[in-house]
Amino acid sequence: NRAVSNNRLPGSSFKPFVYLTAMERNGFNPASIVKDEPVVIEILGSSPWEPRNFSDKYAGDIILKKAMMRSLNSVSVKLIQEVTPEKVIKAARQFGVTSPLGNNLSLALGTSGVSPLEMASAYSTIANLGIYNEPYFVERIEDFKGNPLYENFYHGVQNYAPKSIYPLLNMMQGVIDGGTGRIVRQMGFKHPAGGKTGTTNNFKDSWFDGFTKDFSTSVWVGYDNNEPMIDRHAHGLTGASAAAPIWTLYMEKALQGKNQIKFSIPEGIKFEKVDVYTGTLADSQSIETMNVAVKEETVILPRAIESIPVELDLIEPSTTSELTNVPNP
């Protein structure tokens, strides 16, 4: 039964746990800037590890939300370097991941095996705004007279505050609405949803894990013998091209006749429109902007005044000297 016992590498579908750890433990938020660039990590007694982005292209400074939408490997590796693999493992356990996880930096790219059941369970914790529900198969057993012999009375555990999870949930909605999982929308799926693609080296594993308000579903595609998945056009099958379409077709059937329910926005959350490449409040100089969900106490700064072309004689000297020292976040 591959759904429960097939420990396959999740690839980038593991990244949400890295991002959540960085936001909860190290003060990052969806508008935080990380430089997307080639990374070289020295390993004692071995060759350096040089994780690459899928396209081998790099965006430079970019906000976390956009980095997740584009599934940028270098950003995820930089985050786990800062927060440590131990903290990411601890976070994954809070989401219900029970498989052994390697205590190493490559964990950021999903190099430890998990089951689809674990991923569906973990992603349901995001959809439930931090409430973990242990998976179960049998809800109730009755005898021939209808008397209950067994009932499952498990109640969810609030492992994270709702306002801690919602920024991540919003980022994962971005994956579907305009990121690597956009095929879901292109296929006509209308329900509010979040998710994440995953593809492993040499196209041996293709994942799409996603959720709506009603269901959390994990789709894995691959061969038992680890053979690479190559289509008739000699293209490797990715999470977006193989698993996400299956997820979409399944969820369309599962949600047939159900209302399109939006995710509730918890108390303590606000939305800000920011510059994708500076992390500052959007302004007339912004090339690309994006709405991000952040905790109310999060301060998003305007662009530093010295970077805005102005007529200097229109500014009072006291105002200029005060604001030119405001750093770019």
Where are the regions a protein language model picked out?
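Extracellular glycan-interaction surfaces
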Residues: 20
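Second-shell loop/turn segments in exported
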Residues: 1-8, 50-55, 63, 74-80, ...
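C-terminal functional modules
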Residues: 309-328
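Secondary-structure transition/capping motifs at alpha-helix termini
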Residues: 23-31, 98-100, 128-133, 257
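A penicillin-recognizing enzyme superfamily signal
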Residues: 1-6, 14, 66, 115-291, ...
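Mid-domain, small-residue-enriched loop/turn segments at the edges of structured enzyme/sensor domains
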Residues: 46-52, 83-121, 135-137
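Short active-site loop at a secondary-structure junction
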Residues: 1-17, 30-33, 37, 106
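Conserved catalytic neighborhood of penicillin-recognizing serine enzymes
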Residues: 28-88, 132, 144-174
